[in-house]
UniProtKB/Swiss-Prot annotation:
GO terms for biological process: catabolic process; L-leucine biosynthetic process. Residues 6-258 form the Pyruvate carboxyltransferase domain. Mn(2+) binds at D15, H197, H199. NCBIfam families: 4OH_2_O_val_ald, PRK08195.1. InterPro entries: 2-IPM_HCS-like (IPR050073), 4OH_2_O-val_aldolase (IPR017629), Aldolase_TIM (IPR013785), DmpG_comm (IPR012425), DRE_TIM_HOA (IPR035685), PYR_CT (IPR000891). Substrate binds at R14, D15, S168, H197, Y288. This is 4-hydroxy-2-oxovalerate aldolase 1. It catalyses: (S)-4-hydroxy-2-oxopentanoate = acetaldehyde + pyruvate. Keywords: Aromatic hydrocarbons catabolism, Lyase, Manganese, Metal-binding. Gene3D superfamilies: 1.10.8.60, Aldolase class I (3.20.20.70).
């Protein structure tokens, strides 16, 4: 297969924030960023799991500010570019300016997969500020491939130089991934790049990333030991091993990625980042991966099987930004459970 070199973005220091409650310390950020830079990744994404300015009661407070994390990563990177995510309505154009001044060169403007229109102002502003700008269609499994093409074309028209399919729920199959990249091929100009951001909830992140590359993706998101929301992202060390077997060109060193994953990242996981009964249910139900910790807390508080909460979230089609409604789901399920209990007294 003849193709251009893959551009690998590691998201351990952004999506990986979800896996540890946004609690990296400064030293961990320096260590991980330095190891990634040494291992040859093209870009390192840094910041709160929900993007610039995401630290809040609703999404979870970071141990340190986004700018602090960016400064730490910038202090040790010599080759890799630094990247961030911004969700309109959470991050602002002023946040973009501060991120640029702190060393960020690439920004991904992320919206729900049916709401690309809300990215117009932020994409155009980011282009004017000199960033390489990507549109990021979150929860791409939650709409049709045809609509993905429509939404991607909107982002392109606002100035995005790349559009990512983000399988935030880890719900896509290889066939579903193929269909969405075929839709991008039909909708986008040939000069607009395509990217893939996969999650592991159905154990398909590497397979879906491979299929995406075979269908035109040249920008690939992955994380050390899969560090990310839910069952995690596409594990970078596994994907690079597969890319080597395919003969695809990239700049990464496999053993250095393996060492960073095992020595630096896995020891930080207070909850193993893996496919288990909870994270598998996220993928099965098509639920936003970063809802996992919120659902687990609600399940503990109300003594409900977290899988029931996740399934109900899926039925209600909650999307990112509706984390506060998870408690409502748990309350409703607890009330129903109480009403069905044979030991109920009154």
């Amino acid at each position: 297969m003849t193709m251009t070199r893959l551009f690998i973005t590691d998201v351990t220091l952004r999506d990986g924030m979800h896996a540890i409650g946004h609690r990296y310390d400064r030293g961990q950020v320096r260590e991980i960023a330095a190891a990634l830079d040494e291992a040859g990744v093209d870009a390192i994404e840094v910041g709160h799991g929900d993007g610039l300015n995401g630290s809040s009661l609703a999404y979870g407070f970071s141990r340190h500010s986004d700018l602090s994390y960016i400064h730490e990563a910038a202090s040790v990177t010599r080759r890799a570019k630094l990247a961030c995510v911004l969700l309109p309505g959470i991050g602002t154009i002023e946040d973009l300016k501060r991120a640029r001044d702190s060393g960020i060169e690439l920004v991904r403007i992320a919206t729900h997969c049916t709401e690309a229109d809300v990215s117009a102002q932020h994409i155009s502003a980011a282009v004017e500020l000199g960033f390489h700008v990507s549109g990021f269609l979150m929860m791409s499994s939650a709409t049709t491939p045809e609509n993905i093409g429509v939404q991607a074309a909107k982002m392109e028209s606002y100035g995005a130089q790349c559009v990512y399919i983000a399988d935030s729920a880890g719900n896509l199959t290889p066939a579903g991934t193929t269909a969405r990249f075929q839709a991008l091929e039909a909708a986008l100009d040939g000069a607009t790049q395509r990217g893939i951001h996969a999650h592991e909830n159905l154990s398909l992140s590497v397979a879906n990333t491979v299929v995406a590359v075979e269908n035109g993706a040249r920008r690939v998101d992955a994380a050390l030991a899969g560090m990310g929301a839910g069952a995690g992202n596409c594990p970078i060390e596994a994907f690079i091993a597969v890319a080597n077997k395919y003969g695809w060109e990239h700049g990464c060193e496999l053993f250095k990625l393996q060492d960073a994953a095992e020595d630096l990242v896995r020891p930080l996981q207070d909850r193993p980042v893996r496919v288990d009964r909870q994270t598998l249910t996220l993928g099965y139900a098509g639920v936003y991966s970063s809802f996992l910790r919120h659902a687990e807390r609600a399940a503990n508080e109300f003594d409900i099987d977290v899988r029931e909460i996740i399934l109900e979230i899926g039925r209600r089609e909650l999307i990112g930004g509706q984390e506060d409604m998870i408690i409502d789901v748990a309350l409703d399920l607890a009330a129903h459970q109480s009403a069905q209990s044979p030991n109920r007294t009154g």
